[in-house]
Regions:
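Short, Lys/Arg-rich N-terminal segment immediately upstream of the first membrane anchor
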Residues: 1-8
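Hydrophobic membrane-insertion alpha-helices, especially the h-region
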Residues: 9-26
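N-terminal "domain-start" segment that seeds a small globular fold
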Residues: 22-54
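Short acidic-hydrophobic, aromatic-tinged amphipathic segments that line or gate anion-handling sites
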Residues: 44, 116-120
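Short active-site neighborhood of thiol/selenol oxidoreductases, capturing the structured segment around
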Residues: 52-75, 81
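Hydrophobic beta-strand anchors of alpha/beta hydrolase catalytic cores
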Residues: 63-64, 91, 137
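Structural microenvironment flanking redox-active thiols in thiol-disulfide oxidoreductases
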Residues: 75-111, 121-127
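Thiol/disulfide oxidoreductase modules built on the thioredoxin-like
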Residues: 109-113, 121-166
Length: 168
């Protein structure tokens, strides 16, 4: 009986390692390709504030969240990103081809979401970054990319990535 349990445990650990490896490979394959001046390009939020990613990530890591109003998976990730923002985490979001500023603002208010948004109405930012999947999350610290992932990510997954960027 004990040997059977050990075998199941060993096989479970092997399966877990294979799944983790596959997830890491998929993240590497879908990782954004950043343009040369990505950190110093001025970007404007819906509130009219002009920001650069270098400035946003200078003092503390920033979570960049590429999302879309039409993205099915984003409906699960967006509330968790808003929760991080309400807890004081440094968050900037980019709305990918989700309409004009009024439409994006209306969508945000309808969903009860409050976080800063850069509207990428025509997809120029996402094209220059080679973002092919929504949602995509990028953690930056001091102007450099620390981690990227795409697809569904849990609150704790995002929190852990930000903690890692702050700590190391």
């Amino acid at each position: 009986m004990l040997s059977k349990l050990r075998r199941w445990l060993r096989e479970g650990l092997i399966l877990l390692a294979l799944l983790a490896g596959a997830m890491l490979l998929m993240d590497a394959w879908r990782a954004p390709q950043l343009p040369a001046s990505f950190d110093s390009t001025p970007l404007q939020t819906l509130d009219g504030e002009t920001v650069t990613l270098a400035a946003l990530s200078k003092d503390e890591p920033v979570l960049l969240y590429f999302w879309a109003s039409w993205c099915g998976v984003c409906r699960f990730t967006t509330p968790e990103v808003a929760r991080l923002r309400s807890e004081g985490e440094n968050v900037m979001t980019i709305a990918l081809r989700s309409g004009n500023e009024a439409e994006v603002s209306h969508w945000l208010s309808r969903k009860g979401v409050d976080f800063p948004v850069i509207n990428d109405a025509n997809g120029a930012i996402s094209r220059s970054w080679a973002i092919s999947v929504t949602p995509t999350l990028v953690v930056m610290s001091q102007g450099r990319v620390v981690s990227t992932t795409s697809g569904w990510t849990s609150y704790w997954g995002m929190k852990l990535r930000l903690w890692w960027a702050k700590t190391f």
